[in-house]
């Protein structure tokens, strides 16, 4: 990547390491030194352009690396410049690697949640013209040495297929430990961190590991004091989270727009009405119009009035719709996953979510059962009219409660009819 300024003079070393201050490195003796602010502006331009190129290469809707994001996060960026070719005497940039420590909640191979703060690979890009020339490895290797970290100790923020191949080829990283977030960790991540799974050890596992283990210290920071198990949430914020907002608005705005054009395969018509293009708009027969008018004039049924008065939260259908949120979130997390395979374990999103999901499913099937029962589907014809005739107490709208009662009653009836006493 070329720039209209002297990259070669700006970055004297082949690999330059920048933190959130984006400070220009010391220049070679003898080179003219422009104003510091200009140099920083040049660095910001390079970071912005690299971020854009990386996003394009990864088909991301927006860059996840920019000067602004660098300045507002405690990340470190390794920039590799081209020392061989010197187009127009100004040098060129080959690529970059961005890393940073992040607090994550990761699952170990026993599916226990662990609060850790590993070094994460956040963004990585080598210019298309020089990929597969060993530059990525050179940059990665430099970072490993500088950060004093082993490849298996890293967490990778949604690695691209190319990066997965890269890690496999150069570092033999293949087997992943399934996670419920977008980070990928590999077998060996917990290698020297396994301790008895007591919660008191879990929170301090890193600081202890650093003292007790002879192998290189885990790239972890000291964590805050242990929190109650309930406080630990089974997700971790990815640097790419903000992209979700850009991709899809929240419910209900994310619902598919109404079809303006007819579907490719319209459902088969049940009658010939409307099939002829010559026919004008169909009007109902006069008796139907009269019927409709009489229905409009008909006052609401007293039961309906009573139900409306005792139901402050709107219709039950509406309430049921809003209760589906956890599934919606799960669906969203799947939608945004770059690799569906990583998220196949979302069903293990912690007991709480799983239970909630199961409860939802149960509620839904329960409500369907309930409709069948109230339909008078042959099971309990005497009950179909009864609940409508009386004003139900407010809590009777709890679908699960109703169905439980119905099931108990049915169970009792069955037992009564099948047993001789
Ligand atoms: C957390 C994240 O940052 S995810 C985003 C990662 N970045 C990208 O996907 C952007 C596009 N890709 C790239 O920029 C580069 O290919 C990188 C950064 C992944 C690797 O850099 P390179 O300089 O190409 O890597 P290097 O030459 O050292 O190693 C080559 C190996 O990487 C892998 N690799 C690189 N490019 C490809 C590719 N197009 N297809 C498949 N594997 C590839 C292969 O294992 C390859 O070995 P091989 O050529 O023997 O098959």
Curated annotation (Swiss-Prot):
It comes from the Eukaryota. Widely expressed with highest levels in neuronal tissues. In the brain, expressed in the cortex, cerebellum and hippocampus, including the pyramidal layers in CA1 and CA3, as well as the granular cell layers in the lateral blade (suprapyramidal portion) and the medial blade (infrapyramidal portion) of the dentate gyrus. In testis, mainly expressed in the internal cell layers of seminiferous tubules, where spermatocytes and spermatids are located. Autoacetylation strongly increases tubulin acetylation. Disruption phenotype: Mutant mice are viable and show no overt phenotype. Drastic loss of tubulin acetylation in all tissues anlyzed, including in early embryos. In dorsal hippocampus, but not in ventral hippocampus, the dentate gyrus is slightly deformed, showing a prominent bulge in the lateral blade of the granular cell layers. In addition, the lateral ventricle appears to be dilated. Homozygous mutant males exhibit decreased fertility. Mature spermatozoa from cauda epididymis often show the presence of a cytoplasmic droplet attached to the annulus of the tail, indicative of impaired maturation. Its main location: cytoplasm. Residues 226-235, 352-372, 412-421 have a biased composition (Basic and acidic residues). InterPro entries: Atat (IPR038746), GNAT_ATAT (IPR007965). It catalyses: L-lysyl-[alpha-tubulin] + acetyl-CoA = N(6)-acetyl-L-lysyl-[alpha-tubulin] + CoA + H(+). Its EC number is 2.3.1.108. One of its GO terms (molecular function) is L-lysine N-acetyltransferase activity, acting on acetyl phosphate as donor. Keywords: Acetylation, Acyltransferase, Cell junction, Cell projection, Coated pit, Cytoplasm, Cytoskeleton, Membrane, Methylation, Phosphoprotein, Transferase. Gene3D superfamilies: 3.40.630.30, 6.20.370.120. The keyword Aminoacyl-tRNA synthetase does not apply. The modification Asymmetric dimethylarginine is found at residue 305. Residues 209-221 have a biased composition (Low complexity). The record marks 58 as: Crucial for catalytic activity. Residues 1-190 form the N-acetyltransferase domain. The modification Phosphoserine is found at residues 272, 276, 315. Belongs to the acetyltransferase ATAT1 family. This is Alpha-tubulin N-acetyltransferase 1. It comes from Mus musculus (Mouse). The lineage of its organism: Eukaryota, Metazoa, Chordata, Craniata, Vertebrata. The gene is Atat1.
């Amino acid at each position: 990547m070329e720039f209209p300024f002297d990259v070669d003079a700006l970055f004297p070393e082949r690999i330059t390491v920048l933190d959130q201050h984006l400070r220009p490195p010391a220049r070679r003796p003898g080179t003219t030194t422009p104003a510091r602010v200009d140099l920083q502006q040049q660095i910001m331009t390079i970071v912005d352009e690299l971020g854009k190129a990386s996003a394009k290469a990864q088909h991301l809707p927006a860059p996840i690396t920019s000067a602004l994001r660098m300045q507002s996060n405690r990340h470190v960026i390794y920039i590799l410049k081209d020392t061989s070719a010197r187009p127009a005497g100004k040098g060129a940039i080959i690529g970059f690697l961005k890393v940073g420590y992040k607090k994550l909640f990761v699952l170990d191979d026993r599916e226990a949640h662990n609060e850790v703060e590993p070094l994460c690979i956040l963004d990585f890009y080598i210019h298309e013209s020089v990929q597969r020339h060993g530059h990525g490895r050179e940059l990665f290797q430099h970072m490993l040495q500088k950060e004093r970290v082993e490849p298996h100790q890293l967490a990778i923020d949604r690695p691209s297929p190319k990066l997965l191949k890269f890690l496999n080829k150069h570092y033999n990283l293949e087997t992943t430990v399934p996670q419920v977030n977008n980070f990928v960790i590999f077998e060996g991540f917990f290698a020297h961190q396994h301790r008895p799974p007591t919660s008191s050890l879990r929170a301090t596992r890193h600081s202890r590991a650093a003292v007790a283990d002879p192998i290189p210290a885990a790239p972890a920071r000291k964590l805050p004091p242990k929190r109650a198990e309930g406080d630990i949430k089974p997700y971790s914020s990815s640097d790419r989270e903000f992209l979700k907002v850009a991709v899809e608005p929240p419910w209900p705005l994310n619902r598919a727009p109404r079809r303006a054009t007819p579907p490719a395969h319209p459902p088969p018509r049940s009658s010939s009405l409307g099939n002829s293009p010559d026919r004008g708009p169909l009007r109902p027969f006069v008796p139907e119009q009269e019927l409709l008018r009489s229905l409009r004039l008909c006052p609401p049924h007293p039961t309906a009035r009573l139900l409306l008065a005792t139901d402050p939260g709107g219709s039950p259908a509406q309430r049921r719709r809003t209760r589906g949120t956890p599934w919606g979130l799960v669906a969203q997390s799947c939608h945004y996953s770059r690799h569906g395979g990583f998220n196949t374990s979302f069903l293990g999103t912690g007991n709480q979510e799983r239970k909630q999901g199961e409860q939802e499913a149960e509620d839904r099937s329960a409500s369907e059962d309930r409709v069948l029962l109230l339909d008078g589907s042959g099971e309990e014809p005497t009950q179909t009219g009864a609940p409508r005739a009386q004003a139900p107490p407010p809590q009777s709208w709890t679908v699960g409660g109703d169905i439980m009662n119905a099931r108990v009653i049915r169970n009792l009836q069955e037992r009564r009819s099948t047993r001789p006493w």
